Curated annotation (Swiss-Prot):
Recorded superkingdom: Bacteria
GO MF annotation, one: NADP binding
Assembly and interaction partners: Homodimer.
Binding site for shikimate: S15, L16, S17, T62, N87, D102, Y221
Protein name listed in UniProt: Shikimate dehydrogenase (NADP(+))
Membrane-crossing residue ranges in chain numbering: none
Reaction(s) the record says it catalyses: shikimate + NADP(+) = 3-dehydroshikimate + NADPH + H(+)
PANTHER family linked to this entry: BIFUNCTIONAL 3-DEHYDROQUINATE DEHYDRATASE_SHIKIMATE DEHYDROGENASE, CHLOROPLASTIC, SHIKIMATE DEHYDROGENASE
Function of the molecule: Involved in the biosynthesis of the chorismate, which leads to the biosynthesis of aromatic amino acids. Catalyzes the reversible NADPH linked reduction of 3-dehydroshikimate (DHSA) to yield shikimate (SA).
Amino acid sequence: MKQLYGVIGNPIGHSLSPVMHNDAFEHLNMDAHYHAFLVEEELLGEAVRGLKALGISGFNVTTPHKVAIMEYLDEIDPLARKIGAVNTVVHKDGRLIGYNTDGIGFVRALQSISNEPLQGKRILLLGSGGASRAIYFSLADVGVKEIDVANRTVDKAKELIAARTADVNSVALSLEKATEEQGNYDIIIQTTTIGMHPHVEHTPLQICSLKKGTIVSDIIYNPFETKILCEAKEQGAIIQNGIDMFVYQGALAFEMWTGRTPNIERMKQLVIEKLGG
């Protein structure tokens, strides 16, 4: 019988996940289909019960359901609970188990462009929202020891740092202070929506004094190169946009559901093509 997978969210019509996963199923000769389901917030509980009753094998969760879905699941992975959000659900032995592949997906994406282990790196995170939280805890989970957090509201950065459980040295900074200190970091990660289309002229941090070999990663992929990435490239940095994170988190979910490893490069090229790159 054909296996059913999907993604729930609102809006959902723009999602690239069905194209990416269905191509992977076809490429691996798997009898499976991935579908996008529009789910209103007030109907989330009913939708989850319905998907479970239909025997869905697994599904992704996107805006605005990543936090609210947690109360409807049978089990939540410890890292997802720490992050406070779920983006991947596995249906196993009649139980719905929630995971968060956003942060781990980002870490894998970052490792793919880093010539050295991340563990010894000094990292600056820009922003303290849901994406930043997922990345912060996932970096800590793989043993990164120095992660500073810069935010427009410093208290929000302090809140994120205060929630840590791993042995991580972290300082909360203003964006102004981060601008001054940018040369002290090996990796800078931009996790906010600042610079996203159509506000492409905006940036949370002016890049002006990076040290040689710095990696600057932005989780935005529209545009492909945000202002912060353009400035970093001019400074000679290694840059990475959000396509890698999107692909790696999707590939990780695929592995969790199926036990199979999809072709990452094929996934990435398909997403770039669909985005008009």
